[in-house]
Amino acid sequence: MKNLFNKIFNPEKYLADKRLKIIEKDKKIFKEKYEKQINDVQKSLKNKDEISFLHAGHIGDIINALPVVKEISKSHKCNLIIQTNLPSPDVYSSHPAGKFYLNKKIYDMLYPLLIKQSYIEKVEIYNSQPIDINFNLIRELPINLCFDNKRYWFHIAGIQVDLSKKYLEVEDHANLKNRITICRSLRYQNPFIDYSFLEKYDDIYYIGVLEEYEILKKIIKNLKFYECKDFLEMAMIIKSSKVHIGNQTLGIDIAEGLKSPRIVEVSPYFPTVQIHGENGYEFYFQTHFEKYFNVLNNK
């Protein structure tokens, strides 16, 4: 009854009380369920020579956690354990893993890129192995995730990394070189942006999902499609690209790791991707998109 009275006659107090209840609830959840797990990470880093990381995806999130893995590998042997078939609450039809963060098919495509990294000792599917750092906690903790998603993993491991440095290692692609490449998911598209100006450029390749390509080809009529056999090949193509363009999706996450020329279309509704280091730009608006593209394309 008191809450109803305040809601009607004292809305400021009602909102303050509501906010306080949320805070107290979050504190209780953290204390009872997560504080020990966060503290135990530091004990493992201090006392162990070998560290096993658990990650269930999405694919880009696994790539974005690699700077932390690479940093820890300077003093520890590092194993990356991938959990497949963890149900995702955000199911959408175009996602290649369907109702999961990551399925076995996607794992098989990701494995060659992960095992290529010299700082990772081994990559395995999760089968109840002992885990020291559980990156999956980031989706459970009572915190707001609307910040740079490459920094999520800092808050699980307690490790701060210079994100301007490369953290992916691949060779150049043998055939597809010096092209404009695009990978633009149907999620997180910016409604202020139009890609049609790219139609005047030759040799533009889409290297993502076929459904996404078919939609973008209606806008860029001369857009070509290249089907990557796995994400290692995708990374090799991105490394060899003149410019890679994308929104908040795997292509940009890979380009960030390589520090190759890249431009990211940022979602105005969930801006969790930021550029770090050389050869990269991010944009919200069309005029900046075209400006940054010209800067990189004319280098």
Language-model-derived ranges and their functions:
Residues 1-299:
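Catalytic machinery of carbohydrate-active enzymes
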